[in-house]
Amino acid sequence: MAKVESFTLDHTKVKAPYVRLITEETGKKGDVISNYDLRLVQPNTNAIPTAGLHTIEHLLAGLLRDRLDGVIDCSPFGCRTGFHLITWGEHSTTEVAKALKGSLDAIANDIEWKDVQGTDKYSCGNYRDHSLFSAKEWSKEILSQGISDQPFERHVI
């Protein structure tokens, strides 16, 4: 079986919340795709409940695209501690951390239920499992800790 980088990361050494560049891959035509670890909570210490994480996922899908060029996808980790962000091109971890911070700030302070996309049976595969309250509370908690652009030492942006 292929080795997966995420499973070789020593999860006891990282200091969440942070943004980490996992890899940059160059395709046959020269296009670059970047994969980032957006770690919101400390691994093996806490996990965001699925309803809140699901709502954060739906909101980040739009909010990150508003703040960062080339967003392909932002998908939650199964462990519920953060997200993979996949983009075209190269962005510094500082750039991504600022986009994440702005997005979480919007969730915490500005977003209302009417702003959450994909919350009915036609547009979401598990539309009953959402919580804007949880998404807001977790966003506030993450922002209160500061988002680092480095995974192993705190360099809060």
UniProtKB/Swiss-Prot annotation:
Gene3D superfamilies: S-ribosylhomocysteinase (LuxS). Homodimer. GO terms for molecular function: iron ion binding; S-ribosylhomocysteine lyase activity. SUPFAM superfamilies: LuxS/MPP-like metallohydrolase. NCBIfam families: PRK02260.2-4, PRK02260.3-1. This is S-ribosylhomocysteine lyase 2. It comes from Lactobacillus delbrueckii subsp. bulgaricus (strain ATCC BAA-365 / Lb-18). The gene is luxS2. Its cofactor is Fe cation. Involved in the synthesis of autoinducer 2 (AI-2) which is secreted by bacteria and is used to communicate both the cell density and the metabolic potential of the environment. The regulation of gene expression in response to changes in cell density is called quorum sensing. Catalyzes the transformation of S-ribosylhomocysteine (RHC) to homocysteine (HC) and 4,5-dihydroxy-2,3-pentadione (DPD).
